[in-house]
């Protein structure tokens, strides 16, 4: 009985497209050589670079993503669900006066750290007649109490 050599194609076994395990390298003598087997207890330069990148990202959680050499950015793509820190909520003075009591509840309910910034409106554009009717005249306090109940934010 003749001995047959059992061989298999490692390229068909490897499902990852970026994997190089099925590619053969050649020595100077021309003999094909398999790349070394990965062993988790042996630290390579690639492992060190990956570990340093993770540490850097964790040490600066609010840093904006940096550009890579090919122009792409790492991290979440800016969109309607992602925030870029610091987050500022821009309120006009009348809105701030109206929502003064509920500002803390709003910031507690907001999913990220935020700051309320008061924006000065152009007097020609602002329509304060609606807001003036909602306030009582109380000149000894900094904020004006409300006449009507504002909605409660959960």
Curated annotation (Swiss-Prot):
Residues 54-86, 121-154 are annotated as: Disordered. A motif (WRPW motif) lies at residues 38-41. It holds the Pfam family Ripply. The keyword Repeat does not apply. Residues 121-140 have a biased composition (Acidic residues). The keyword Nucleus applies. Residues 85-119 are annotated as: Ripply homology domain. It is found in: Nucleus. GO terms for cellular component: nucleus. GO terms for biological process: embryonic pattern specification; negative regulation of transcription by RNA polymerase II; somitogenesis. In the late gastrula stage, expression appears in the dorsal presomitic mesoderm and in the first three pairs of nascent somites. Expressed strongly in forming somites and then expression is rapidly down-regulated except in the first somite pair where expression is maintained for a longer period. Also expressed in the presumptive notochord and in the tail bud at the 48 hour larval stage. Expression disappears by the 72 hour stage. Signal peptide: none annotated. Keywords: Developmental protein, Nucleus. May play a role in somitogenesis. Belongs to the ripply family. This is Protein ripply.
